[in-house]
Amino acid sequence: GSRGVIRADHINELSAAIVRVQRILKRENPHLDRSILIEKFIEGHEYAVEGVLCSGEFQCLAIFDKPDPLDGPYFEETIYLTPPDIRNDLETDILKTVAIACRAIGLTHGPIHAECRVNSKGVWVLEVAPRTIGGQCGRLLELALGLSLEEVIMSNALGHSACVENDGQAAG
């Protein structure tokens, strides 16, 4: 999740963020490696992508809009909406970028959850992971697809194509 993700624009903010994240890590698991990943903040509108891979082919189950700005310093997610109100060419760019990211890290089969930001320079992948979406968002997929997320994932695990179409049913 976004626990421990803190935006820091200046060195004093970075120092305070490191102390805070180290406390979170120590509380979560005192034996865990306390390495911290520091990344550049990418401005833009954020989307989540849920899909499945079958023999390396990516099939999108849904794109979720994150309509509330996630500009920090903390990144609490409040609501996901699907389908997003975006142009067809932007949807295509998001899906192509996620598929390329999956190939780049060697993912070929199973569920995919990705998060992207879109700005004037293009689509930026923030995360791509071989897992399903968390929280209550799986229920949104059922509303949009007519199948439960579990049914789709089990079918994919058995080697069947997901063969689902998002009928455009709004959910959020």
Spans of model-derived segments:
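Internal nucleotide-binding/catalytic subdomain
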Residues: 4-121
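Active-site-proximal flexible loops/turns
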Residues: 47, 122, 134, 138
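A short beta-strand motif that forms the metal-chelation/ATP-contact edge
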Residues: 51, 122-132
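Active-site "cap" helix and flanking loop/linker of ATP-utilizing ligase/carboxylase catalytic domains
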Residues: 93-114, 129-172
